Every structure is written in C-alpha cells, then in structure tokens.
A protein has these predicted regions:
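Generic protein-terminus/edge-of-domain signal
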Residues: 1-42
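Short hydrophobic beta-strand segments that form the core of ligand-binding sensory/regulatory domains
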Residues: 21-23, 66-70, 90
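Amphipathic alpha-helical segments enriched in hydrophobic/aromatic residues interleaved with Lys/Arg
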Residues: 90-137, 141, 145, 167
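Double-stranded beta-helix
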Residues: 76-92
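Ligand-binding loop in jelly-roll beta-barrel domains
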Residues: 53-74, 80-82
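Short, Lys/Arg-enriched, Trp-marked, Pro/Gly-tolerant hinge/linker segments that flank
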Residues: 100, 123-130, 143-181
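Conserved metal-binding segment of the jelly-roll/cupin
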Residues: 41-54, 70
Length: 182
C-alpha cells in the first residue's frame, strides 16, 4: 500500500487522473477534494475514482495507508466499463468514498494483498489478459456496494449544482448510447 508520506506529496496541487482507480483505505485518514467536493477517507473506506477525476489531497494522517489498483481509460473503454456502471455514475461521482462493513473490509484487504503478492512475485501472474477478470470482480463489487449502501448524502442542491448534475447524467447517457452504436 501507499503510506501517508507519499500521499502527502500529492497534496501540493490538484491533478486530473486519467485512469479509473479503485482504492481501499486500510488505516488512518485522508482529507481529499474529489471533483470539487471535499471527502474524508478513513480505515475501511472504499474509494472509486472514475477516469478524468480531479483530485487534491489536503491532509493525510501519519499512519494512513491506501491500497489501490488503477486501470487505464483505454483498458476501461475496451471492456465497456461505463456501460456497465452507467446507472450508478452520478451516485459514484457524488459519493466516491464508501464505508464498508467489517466483513466486506476484510475481504477487500485480502483482495488487495493478493494482488500485491501476485504483482511482486518473480513469476507474476498479472498480465493484460488476467487483468480483465480482476477488473470484473472490482466492478461487480462496486456495483453491489453502491446498490446496498442506501444512505447517500443527498445535499440540498443549488440550481447550478442541479443543472450540473442533470448535464452529467445526459453526457453519460449520450456517451453510452454512442459507444453501444459503434
């Protein structure tokens, strides 16, 4: 996993992440702005960052540790990632940090530990062909996670935010329609 001191290096400026990132906070806290909304990730929180997300880390506790896996936007396009999660996109954008139950957190901790072991082994089994099933597991986990978690923050939206939300939904609908036609 990535430790707090390395995470602090990303706090100097906001950056755009082109990849899709699935992360799991194993300990500590991280105060971060994701697409202009501030969040705090704590131990046992799962973080989903869609491609082209803007992120800035503000504060990281000394004991913070995050495990993550990132997939290039090209790889995600090749497996129709956006179509798979299309009905959850706005929810994911508005709620990128999800607290997990103890049991689910233990499973994700084991999952990420296994990925690290597989990647660091001299005879690594992680190749492009083997990454699709890994991504499939993560996607299904995220879909189930977002369907089960029903206490999403529903902020009182200003008219500007309401228009922006509707615009994002329309853009994603158009994107998935265009991608399915090709």
């Amino acid at each position: 996993g990535i430790m707090g001191d390395i995470l602090n290096m990303y706090g100097l400026f906001p950056c755009k992440i082109k990849a899709g990132v699935f992360a799991f906070c194993t300990r500590g806290t991280i105060r971060v702005t994701i697409n202009l909304d501030e969040h705090t990730a704590r131990a046992n929180d799962f973080i989903t960052l869609l491609p082209n997300t803007f992120i800035q880390i503000h504060e990281v506790s000394e004991d913070a540790e995050v495990c993550f896996v990132a997939f290039s936007s090209r790889f995600l396009e090749s497996i129709n990632f956006i179509r798979t999660i299309s009905n959850l996109i706005v929810t994911i954008i508005e709620n990128p940090v999800v607290p997990l139950s103890g049991n689910a957190a233990a499973i994700y901790k084991d999952f990420f530990s296994l990925l690290v072991r597989a990647d660091n082994a001299p005879d690594s089994i992680l190749f492009t062909d083997s990454l699709k099933p890994v991504l499939d597991l993560l996607i299904q986990g995220v879909v189930n996670m977002y369907r089960r978690f029903n206490t999403w923050k529903e902020p009182v939206l200003s008219r500007d935010k309401e228009i922006a939300r509707e615009f994002v939904q329309l853009v994603w609908q158009y994107y998935t329609k265009e991608r399915s036609a090709s």
